[in-house]
Design a protein with these regions (language model features):
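Glycan-recognition and catalytic cores of secretory/periplasmic carbohydrate-active enzymes
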Residues: 1-229
Length: 229
């Protein structure tokens, strides 16, 4: 998105449309600052320069947790615009998720050997959202099944909290836990809400006590946990 003066100086009349100087306007390079809307010929020349460059990395992998969040978003949108077909889109999209991510084991992305607690958390959440909106019992049945799986695979019974990775016998050094909100609400908060929605009262009580303990230290990073509690 930046250019050198040498790249631009031979484009006819470019100085009429952009403020370009030999010394540049950002660390010796030029960020194009429009003086007026450029014509198609100028844009074509600029694109020709850019097409010769190495393109930035683009992450093409699909993630289960993000796709499930999209389903929940469609369900929420349906509650506001019920006649626009968003609920049907959500159901169709979930069918693709089930086919591509859940046909054998739950997996996070392209590797069928890896899954994380956030995958289960958001999968269960989207199933419960679909269940509440469609009243189709199959979604709630699946949500309960995956919740049981999540407890078996990720729940640390000693610390009363979900760890990020699956429990394995070779957990030697550390067991990372997901309690802080980053780009998404943390998985333990989502699982606490899932427990409550499914009627897993004992599990919800146990997890809420653990999250409340972490809140005393990390409350600035656990906004979603406050909501869950």
């Amino acid at each position: 998105y930046v250019y050198s003066y040498d790249e631009l100086k031979n484009i006819k009349d470019i100085e009429k449309f952009f403020d370009i100087r030999p010394e540049g306007n950002w660390e010796g390079k030029i960020i194009l600052d429009e003086l007026k809307v450029p014509n198609e010929e100028i844009i074509k020349k600029l694109m020709e320069i850019r097409m010769k460059r190495k393109k930035p990395f683009f992450d093409k992998k699909n993630q289960l947790d993000l796709n499930c969040l999209w389903v929940s978003s469609l369900v929420s949108l349906n509650s506001v615009l019920p006649n626009e077909g968003y609920l049907k889109q959500a159901e169709n999209f979930y069918e693709k998720i089930e086919k591509n991510f859940c046909s054998k084991n739950i997996f996070h992305s392209y590797s069928e050997n890896i899954s994380f607690i956030e995958d289960y958390a958001y999968l269960i959440q989207c199933l419960l959202d679909l269940s509440d909106s469609t009243m189709n019992p199959k979604y709630r049945i699946s949500a309960k099944k995956y919740c049981d799986e999540a407890i078996k695979k990720f729940y640390d019974g000693n610390n009363k909290i979900f760890q990020k990775n699956e429990k394995r016998k070779n957990d030697i050094f550390m067991k990372p836990i997901d309690i802080s909100d980053n780009t998404l609400p943390n998985a333990n908060s989502i699982m606490l809400i899932n427990f409550s929605r499914l009627g897993f009262i004992d599990q919800a009580k146990e997890l809420s006590v653990s999250l409340n303990g972490y809140l005393n230290i990390y409350k600035n990073f656990m906004v979603s946990s406050l909501k869950a509690l």
